[in-house]
Swiss-Prot record:
Its EC number(s): 4.2.1.182
Enzyme class: lyase
Chemical reaction(s) catalysed: (R)-5-phosphomevalonate = (2E)-3-methyl-5-phosphooxypent-2-enoate + H2O
Alphabetical UniProt keywords: Isoprene biosynthesis, Lyase
Function: Component of a hydro-lyase that catalyzes the dehydration of mevalonate 5-phosphate (MVA5P) to form trans-anhydromevalonate 5-phosphate (tAHMP). Involved in the archaeal mevalonate (MVA) pathway, which provides fundamental precursors for isoprenoid biosynthesis, such as isopentenyl diphosphate (IPP) and dimethylallyl diphosphate (DMAPP).
Recorded family membership: Belongs to the AcnX type II small subunit family.
PANTHER family with a match to the protein in the record: DUF521 DOMAIN PROTEIN (AFU_ORTHOLOGUE AFUA_6G00490)
Protein name per UniProt: Phosphomevalonate dehydratase small subunit
Length: 129
């Protein structure tokens, strides 16, 4: 299945999706190792390590951009797919050099799906559907 969205940050990555149905704040929401520590998150206790993070949109502090940058530079966060990207998440992905596509119907993607995020064209492919 192929979903057409909007390119925010360039690059192409294939990997396993981890999907949240709730908006996410990177400041206080995730630790340095990529573990989700926000107790209000539907992904509390899970890890972003080596995954493509799919969530509706970001919320919270501008420091979140630097958290995303740090996760990307440590090789923990591989890519992002949003329903609606906002400047904090966009800045972090661009600085971190990870692909980001938004305007995607994230309801089509499930945790564990193998996906390809093409930040050059704005396309997300779900390989196992």
């Amino acid at each position: 299945m192929e979903l057409k969205g909007r390119s925010i940050s360039k690059g192409i990555i294939e990997g396993i999706a981890i999907v949240s149905k709730k908006p996410f704040s990177f400041l206080g929401g995730v630790d340095e190792e990529g573990n989700i520590i926000d107790k209000d998150s539907d992904l509390y206790g899970q890890s972003l390590k080596g995954k493509i993070f799919v969530f509706p949109y970001g919320r919270g502090s501008t420091v979140g951009s630097y958290v995303i940058y740090g996760l990307a530079k440590r090789g923990i966060l591989k890519g992002i797919v949003n329903k609606e990207c906002e400047p904090i998440v966009a800045t972090g992905a661009i600085l971190g050099g990870i692909p980001l596509v938004d305007k995607i119907d994230i309801e089509e993607i499930k945790t564990g799906d193998r996906i390809v995020v093409d930040g050059n064209t704005g396309v997300v492919k779900i390989l196992n559907k």
